């Protein structure tokens, strides 16, 4: 960026105009340039420190104020601003040391507040509490400080009351409203939390339209608003992050992503750690490589969101990067005790063990499951006793604790089941699920996985229907919210139990919804009905009826520009590979017209599959596939060449 040229005599006026117009970046550039000429100018350093503070660059602000203290040690404000800048930069030991230089009685109250904030930042809650108790009780900020301490101790309800009292005394303040929302979120009372968040957002839009709320979601290209003090005071970033977290907890994943794009636009290097963490987490399904990079980057920062460490390890386990998870645990032993609960550590330890010693891992998981089931039995008893005593608060507390324990138990149970699933020992998987029916029979994830394991056993389609049907009926009005695999498995189960009418009715329902979406959004690709037909085609191929099965597979991918995708190609090529294998062994013969149909299909896939990946590679794969080979076009040519070779047709 070119340095602004300023005429003689206009320097001071230009600087103050830039500051007045909140063009701090330009002001910093001019001031930095001028300070090279006038080394350690007090006026220049003071303005530069102020500008750095306004754009939240606290490290450089602290550097300016440190120089100012050396120039003018008698000015107490510089000592205060220096300590505040160090605190804001999370340099807590340095900030605490700087506060001791404040010996003017007029700054006693501010010094105490700053020292308490430093102790709070260092998570020295008892130290912070003793300092807060020294402050005047009539100071409304003491209510806020006590609220923060109560929140940190997990007393969310009492903390919430403190913040509400402070708001009544001080009037509406965005940061207080956010604190109240955060308390409600921690108590899992999402409706009042969202109400306070909505208030913050509405006020931010009304008072600061220049911050461009919602512009990115609308697809409008806007320049970064930067990390200004104004943005910080609106609490918009915090509000949108909390809204995203609530929507994510409620499994409204699109709304969660939208909350992140609705926030005022900033460039990636300007993003705060919480936003970066949430972006990584909520876009993991579509941008896993990027997500891992962001979480790994955050782990190197100080401080980072406390959830980062556990989430990175859990995601490594989800994607089966157990070696990486083990490395992170070994390299960051000091973080283990600080950021991982005993439950999470034991769970991750068992998951890592799965890779090399599945039997040992199963025993570790079994021990963890036993501990959690014991807790749930105790909590069930507490709920019954509280209901008998008509103690609604105790009932509510015990039910919440039970639900939290169940959410810990489900992943442990699924990890146990997966060990036997990978061995294709489906009877053992079913046995594990049956043992957990006492606790999980109402849980959607449990019901879904029970359905899958029954479906895989071939002779239990009727029982599988009993579990798949309630899931589908629950979302019948928005049937495309159900995964295509579930719909396909239910259709196959209907066919295998001679309930063809039910299968056809379900397929008509899917077709009707797909037509409606195609009408509203012609460019959107929807694969549900296509995958259902592909799975049915696969079923007929598996039963040896290749002519009907392959024909169904081919028809399901029409029109190719709408139906050909990585997932649909995966199902189609499996059928073709099975067909070619059986033809090469002379176990089946195809009529010439069917072979012609197959060749035409593969040629269509070759045309439409140029920009479609044949395989979605793992995000952290070191050896990447050749870009020219990882396409549907390349694989369809390979299949066509094999078909010509096996049938001895002339090219």
From Swiss-Prot:
GO terms for molecular function: intraciliary transport particle B binding. GO terms for cellular component: axonemal microtubule; cilium; intraciliary transport particle B. GO terms for biological process: intraciliary transport; protein polyglutamylation. Keywords: Cell projection, Cilium, Cilium biogenesis/degradation, Coiled coil, Repeat, TPR repeat. Gene3D superfamilies: Tetratricopeptide repeat domain. Residues 494-521 form a coiled coil. TPR repeats lie at residues 8-41, 42-75, 140-173, 175-207, 372-405, 410-443, 445-478, 530-563. InterPro entries: TPR-like_helical_dom_sf, TPR_rpt, TT30. It is found in: Cell projection, Cilium. Its main location: other. Required for polyglutamylation of axonemal tubulin. Plays a role in anterograde intraflagellar transport (IFT), the process by which cilia precursors are transported from the base of the cilium to the site of their incorporation at the tip. PANTHER family: TETRATRICOPEPTIDE REPEAT PROTEIN 30. Belongs to the TTC30/dfy-1/fleer family. This is Intraflagellar transport protein 70A. It comes from Xenopus laevis (African clawed frog). The lineage of its organism: Eukaryota, Metazoa, Chordata, Craniata, Vertebrata.
């Amino acid at each position: 960026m070119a340095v602004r040229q300023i005429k003689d005599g206009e320097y001071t006026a230009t600087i103050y105009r830039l500051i007045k117009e909140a063009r701090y970046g330009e002001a910093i550039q001019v001031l930095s340039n001028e300070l090279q000429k006038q080394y350690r100018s007090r006026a220049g350093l003071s303005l530069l420190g102020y500008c750095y503070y306004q754009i939240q660059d606290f490290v450089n602000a602290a550097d300016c104020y440190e120089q100012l203290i050396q120039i003018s040690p008698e000015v107490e404000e510089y000592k205060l601003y220096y300590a505040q800048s160090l605190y804001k930069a999370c340099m807590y030991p340095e900030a605490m040391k700087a506060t001791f230089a404040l010996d003017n009685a007029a700054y006693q109250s501010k010094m105490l507040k700053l020292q308490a904030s430093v102790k709070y930042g260092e998570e020295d809650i008892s130290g912070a509490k003793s300092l807060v108790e020294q402050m005047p009780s009539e100071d409304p900020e003491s209510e806020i400080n006590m609220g923060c301490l109560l929140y940190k101790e997990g007393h969310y309800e009492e903390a919430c009351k403190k913040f509400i009292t402070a708001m009544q005394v001080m009037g509406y303040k965005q940061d207080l409203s956010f604190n109240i929302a955060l308390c409600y979120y921690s108590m899992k009372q999402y409706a009042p939390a969202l109400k306070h968040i909505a208030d913050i957002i509405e006020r931010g839009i009304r008072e600061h339209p220049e911050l461009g709320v919602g512009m990115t979601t609308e697809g409008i290209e806007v320049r970064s608003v930067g990390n200004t003090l104004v943005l910080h005071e609106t609490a918009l970033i915090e509000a949108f992050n909390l809204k995203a977290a609530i929507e994510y907890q409620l499994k409204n994943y699109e709304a969660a992503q939208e909350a992140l794009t609705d926030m005022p636009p900033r460039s990636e290097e300007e993003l705060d750690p919480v936003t970066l963490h949430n972006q990584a987490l909520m876009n993991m399904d579509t941008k896993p490589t990027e997500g891992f990079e962001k979480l790994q980057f955050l782990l190197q920062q100080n401080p980072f969101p406390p959830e980062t460490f556990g989430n990175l390890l859990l995601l490594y386990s989800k994607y089966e990067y157990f070696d990486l998870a083990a490395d992170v645990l070994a390299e960051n032993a000091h973080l283990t005790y600080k950021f991982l609960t005993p439950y999470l550590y034991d769970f991750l330890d068992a998951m890592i063990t799965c890779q090399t010693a599945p039997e040992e891992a199963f025993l570790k998981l079994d021990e963890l499951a036993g501990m959690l089931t014991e807790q749930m039995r105790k909590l069930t008893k507490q709920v019954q006793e509280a209901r008998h005593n008509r103690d609604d608060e105790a009932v509510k507390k015990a039910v919440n604790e039970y639900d939290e324990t169940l959410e810990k138990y489900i992943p442990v149970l699924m990890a146990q089941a997966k060990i036997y699933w990978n061995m294709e020992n489906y009877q053992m998987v079913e046995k594990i699920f049956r043992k957990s029916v006492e606790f999980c029979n109402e849980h959607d994830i449990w019901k879904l996985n029970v359905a899958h394991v029954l479906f895989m056993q071939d002779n239990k389609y009727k029982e599988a229907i009993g579990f798949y049907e309630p899931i589908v009926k629950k979302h019948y009005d928005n049937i495309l919210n159900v995964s295509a695999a579930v719909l396909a498995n239910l259709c196959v189960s209907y066919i295998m139990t001679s309930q063809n009418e039910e299968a056809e009715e379900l397929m008509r329902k899917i077709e009707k919804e797909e037509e409606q979406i195609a009408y509203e959004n012609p460019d959107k690709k929807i694969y549900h009905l296509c995958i259902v037909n592909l799975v049915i085609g696969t079923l007929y191929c598996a039963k040896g009826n290749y002519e009907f099965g392959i024909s169904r597979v081919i028809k399901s991918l029409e029109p190719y520009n709408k139906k050909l995708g990585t997932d649909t190609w995966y199902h189609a090529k499996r059928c073709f590979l099975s067909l070619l294998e059986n033809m090469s062994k002379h176990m089946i013969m195809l009529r010439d017209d069917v072979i012609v149909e197959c060749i035409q299909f593969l040629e269509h896939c070759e045309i439409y599959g140029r920009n479609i990946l044949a395989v979605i590679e793992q995000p952290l794969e070191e050896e990447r596939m050749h870009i020219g080979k990882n396409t549907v076009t390349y694989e369809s040519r390979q299949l066509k060449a094999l078909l010509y070779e096996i049938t001895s047709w002339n090219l």
